């Protein structure tokens, strides 16, 4: 089975690379991301829009509710294996993402060591200025309503209303900074949807730097890919 693995830090273009490859091969993209499993956080979690799919197939490990808690790395790995097995008759899959915990679980599993011909694309964190510019562009887009009317701040305000989910939001990059920003500014959470221009610029700036910190963590902690590629283990 052909297995195309595309991974690396946040905001390095993994999704666009995966979509382009899916258009060329016809293989489905299986998303190696635990937060994208939840449509309640589709914008902040980084789910591309239907238009961005460009007719390709994008498969999430589950379609869950945050009320059940964020899926564990162990459970996510079980779902990933099941998704790959389900698509074996197609001859290939594209695995795309950057979840540190899920990739570490993959690296521990012998499942991936045989039966696959690997094509590995490891995207890397570039210069700080380039990353921050790309991150700010992405975040500014997230602040605008998408075709379904969803925006990053709208998602945050909506989910925050459920007290039991607040700890979950506080543990997710981006949402965490926005929550801290509201506290430091003395704002009620609802007020985040009506920030003035200066406040919005401050929020975007801070979120971009939080993304940079997370990207550096991913750069350091994601498993090293196999140098050979082809058959055998995908990681060193």
Curated annotation (Swiss-Prot):
Species this protein is from: Allorhizobium ampelinum (strain ATCC BAA-846 / DSM 112012 / S4)
GO MF annotation list: AMP dimethylallyltransferase activity
InterPro entries xrefs: P-loop_NTPase, Tzs
EC assignment: 2.5.1.27
Family: Belongs to the isopentenyl transferase family.
Catalysed reactions, as listed in the record: dimethylallyl diphosphate + AMP = N(6)-(dimethylallyl)adenosine 5'-phosphate + diphosphate
Top-level EC class: transferase
Its biological purpose: Transfers dimethylallyl groups to AMP as part of the biosynthesis of cytokinin phytohormones.
Biological process according to GO: cytokinin biosynthetic process
Record keywords, A-Z: Crown gall tumor, Cytokinin biosynthesis, Plasmid, Transferase
Protein name: Adenylate dimethylallyltransferase
The keyword Transferase is assigned to this record: yes
Pfam families in the cross-refs: IPT (PF01745)
């Amino acid at each position: 089975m052909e297995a195309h693995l595309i991974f690396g830090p946040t905001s390095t273009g993994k999704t666009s690379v995966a979509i382009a490859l899916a258009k060329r091969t016809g293989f489905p993209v299986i998303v190696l991301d635990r937060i994208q499993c939840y449509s309640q956080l589709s914008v902040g979690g980084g789910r591309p829009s239907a238009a961005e799919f460009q007719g390709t197939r994008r498969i999430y490990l589950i379609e869950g509710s945050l009320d059940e808690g964020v899926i564990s790395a162990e459970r996510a790995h079980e779902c990933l294996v099941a998704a790959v097995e389900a698509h074996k008759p197609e001859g290939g899959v594209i695995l795309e993402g950057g979840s540190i915990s899920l990739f570490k679980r993959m690296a521990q599993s012998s499942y991936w060591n045989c039966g696959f011909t690997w094509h590995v694309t490891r995207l890397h964190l570039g210069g700080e200025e380039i990353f921050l510019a790309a991150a700010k562009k992405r975040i500014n887009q997230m602040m605008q309503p998408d075709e379904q009317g969803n925006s990053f701040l709208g998602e945050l305000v909506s989910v925050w209303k459920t007290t039991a989910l607040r700890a979950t939001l506080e543990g997710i990059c981006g949402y965490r900074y926005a929550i801290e920003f509201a506290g430091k500014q003395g704002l009620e959470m609802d007020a985040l949807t009506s920030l003035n221009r200066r406040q919005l610029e401050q929020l975007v700036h801070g979120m971009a730097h939080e993304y940079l910190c997370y990207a550096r963590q991913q750069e350091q902690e994601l498993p090293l890919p196999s140098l050979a590629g082809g058959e055998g283990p995908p990681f060193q």
